[in-house]
Amino acid sequence: ILDMEPPRVNAYTLETSIAEKLEAIIHNGYFNSRYKDFYDIYVLSKKYVFSYAELRNAVIQTFENRKTPMTMDSAAFSDEFLNDPVHQTRWKSFLKKKKALIQVSMSDAMDWIKAFVRPLFEGTEKTRWNPEKGNWE
């Protein structure tokens, strides 16, 4: 083994991972049952600093590749989705089943995610995401 070349591992960047999850959320809309995508975006944005330009570029590329409109007008971000008892129950079940380390209400997670992704769609000139403050600077 020692005389073999090191293996090459292909992996998504965090920015591409977020872009892929965000596109799936927007694409699936109201009938989205991929609560892990919401949770992952929430957790990653609570933990890591992101470059606005790098993350926005990943989002643009992903949405263009999938031919998905870049808009926050998805039913997945609507009050109707958030207040739907079925989605609320499924969110709680997801957290329990996955033994989520960060327990967060669906409402709090969605508010945080919206603050994180909205400027990416609006093209607002920002520099970096501050995970401690929960805002773009």
Predicted regions and their residues:
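Structured mid-to-C-terminal alpha-helical surface segments
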Residues: I1-E137
